Amino acid sequence: MKKVFKKCAPTPVYISPNQLTLDCFKTPFEQQLNHTNRWVVLAHLIPWDEVCNLYLKHVGVSDTGRPPLNPRVVLGSLIIKHMCNLDDRETVDQISENIYMQYFLGYSTFTSEAPFDASLFVEFRKRLGMDTLNAINEKIASLKTHMETKEKETTPTTDLEPLPDNSNSTESKNKGRIIFDATACPQDIAYPTDLDLLSDARKKSEELIDKLYSPALHVKKPRTYRRIARKLYLGTAQKKNKSRKQIRKATGSQLRLIKRNLKSINRLLDTYPQIPLKPKDYKYLLVINTFYEQQQQMYDSQSHRIEDRIVSIHQPHVRPIVRGKSQAKVEFGAKIHVSIIDGISFLDELSWDAFNEGSHMMDYVEKYHLRFGCYPRELLADQIYCTRANRAALKEKGIKLLAKPLGRPSAVQVHVSPGERNPIEGKFRQAKTAYGLNRIKAKLRDTSESWIASIILVLNLVKLAGVALPCFIVKFIDNLYASFSARWLIVPDSQFAYDNCGQLILMTEIFNSNKNNPKKRFLSFSADPI
């Protein structure tokens, strides 16, 4: 097999910095952009009019105040951020430096100015929400179905194709294959231990006392013993090996200090006609009260289990998700259920509490019916979905379950091979490794949901871009061919179909149709006249 060498840029000759000037630096901005660049392909792939209308319908347009940002800039910036796995500030810097990204956002000319302040990303995630991003994902994912429909229309039918078997009318109406699976999306928080969480709650309660104390209303400021409390905490936390007795003793001391601080906060609040705290601080107060009750109950019963356990003072919506994996038996974040249909991912459910995906399987099947107007022909799922009730419900709807059958193992293995579920496992690996699904850095509940939905959207865009790239290459080549055909009076033998996006056979057809005409083949793939 002949080795393919990648063409690299020429290595520049070293020049002293004293001889380099910014004005003399040559730029390629006067040349045409590369048509095969990923941002150019995505810019032509996304239906911006429909997507922007969905955004404006959800956000709304006000006649007063500052004019809103361009919806394409808002949505495109989120796509760039998650596709490149950048933080908010780095995303703004990359956009101001990259001409292809600016073309993707709809800019007509290059500008070195930042499109907006990086802090607006938080507002974008708040405004969009998971539902709007899922609607945009559905709209973009429909492009795959549209491509396949046009491909079937352009593909000629032959008499050798077998006729459809209508022996089972219910099963014949079902179309497609669907793969189910669930995973956890860990939040960017420290691993929670009771002692560390108690220390965080104690320090936050001390801050609330400082904010509530007023010399005009209170004679003496309540004592918090923060130095002693910090010393007691570090005395145990910094030990390499801690016994149960030492941990219980340190936990009890922190609980008593938090109880004292909460009593002081209540006495300070009694002197005010209304609660003077800001909404954010008042939320911290409610979280600390709930957290103290949970920890005190576990301390008294000497257990480590409780319902709706708080694992982060700053993100109280996060819950522990028991996964049973070898690397992490418990993950802290949201649990999502994803279905894959022909390489396209759909976010079926997102919950901050653990749930059994097998008990919700028929709800996911009904969502497939809402999207495509029919039930799937085949369903591929893990063992947790294959209960007797689910098997009976799928059989009633004519859906074939590709899983190990119940009962005594047969002599011939007929169940599905483990590699059949590789596509969805690969999607999870791609999302967690390349796009940051294994570390959600958003702090709020709604912004975290938008973060996860944006990553699912990026997965589909990457998939569709890989399908559509050969189509854009062929279209660009044929445009060059058409421009030179008029000059050289060359009439093409046949019109190439561009609707078959992603079919590698198109490139072969172009070579085969022109192989007997060297002049024509040269004009089809070269922009230089002979």
Q: Predicted segment positions?
A:
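Basic, short loop/linker segments at the boundary and entry of helix-turn-helix/winged-helix-like folds
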Residues: L33-I79, M83
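Short, conserved catalytic/metal-binding motifs centered on acidic residues
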Residues: N37, L75-S77, T91-I95, D117-F121, ...
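Basic, amphipathic alpha-helical segments enriched in Lys/Arg and hydrophobic/aromatic residues
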Residues: Y284-L286, Y292-Y299, V416-N500, L504-I510
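Short, basic/hydrophobic alpha-helical segments
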Residues: I80, Y213, H360-E378
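Electropositive, glycine- and tryptophan-enriched low-complexity nucleic-acid-binding patches
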Residues: K325-R371
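Active-site- or DNA-interface-adjacent structural scaffold in DNA-acting proteins
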Residues: S108, S112-Q315
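Charged, often Cys/His-bearing segments associated with DNA-binding zinc-finger transcription factors
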Residues: M1-P47, P409, L469-I530
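Acidic, metal-coordinating catalytic cores used for nucleic-acid/nucleotide bond scission
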Residues: G65-L69, H82, I99, L380-A389, ...
